[in-house]
Amino acid sequence: MENQGKKGIKVLFSFENRKVAMRVENPKQSIKQTIENIKKEARNDPEKIWYLPEMDAGDNIIRYYLGRKDEKGKDEILKEKNKEGLEQSLYDYGVKEGDHLVIIKKVIAG
């Protein structure tokens, strides 16, 4: 995911009251991979983007998900897999240039 060039789509991501526009190079890659790419970008520049730790202070795993408002204004989590168990992508959810997605943090208690 880079902010240079014209490949892919530019999406506005928000997390903890900070919004950052990022270019998703391949909107057909899995949502899981997209989240991994966001985390990688955040690790490279946490001051400019976000701090997205893998563990909390109590050594509990932190998972991240993507969400948005659906056409009716309700919150929707973009699931990594569909009912058939196939990986989903931003393309599968119809995410397009300029859309706004929210990064959702969930602590998994150990």
What kind of feature is each model-predicted range?
Residues 1-110:
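Ubiquitin system architectures
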